[in-house]
Amino acid sequence: EIAQCLVGSEMCIRDRTIDYHYGKHLQTYVNNLNNLVPGTEFEGKDLVTIVATAPDGAIFNNAGQVLNHTLYFLQFAPKPAHSEPTGKLAEAIKRDFGSFENFKKEFNAAAVGLFGSGWAWLSADKNGKLHITKEANGSNPVRAGLVPLLGFDVWEHAYYLDYQNRRADHVNELWSIIDWDVVGKRLK
């Protein structure tokens, strides 16, 4: 399913980046996690539970990156139906950020301003309020009890082959392939 989302997304993520990012980086995290979990208290648990409850360490790091990358790649479409969120998500963004443009500005600032490697997330709390967070390394907002809706990977492997040190260009281009229907369904 993830691979289908990437077909034709040449607009801002080139094939060579997909090959490394999806085919090598993500696959390594999956393989590592599959080797680490058997025989532990996390065997048989879903990714969200593992990420939310695992102590810092190898299981958490690999589970976090599998969850993060799965959410990341599934939110893309080569030709999204909408260039902005619709419905309940659009209403929540307007309520919590004033407008979609204000939200994008704040989100871009978080993604570009994150020092080092990590993720920028739009998440919802249990009351439906939206939050923008910056998560270092493989962390995810589920650790704080939030539901991740939209995530931008700002690890260098996500953009360096295409954008070199131009993280802001990478972040700006990702908006063109966001499948707002997928992101909207994550808001409960």
How does the language model describe each region?
Residues E1-G8:
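Single conserved hydrophobic/aromatic residue that forms the stacking wall/gate
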Residues S9-K188:
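Feature for soluble, non-membrane regions of globular proteins
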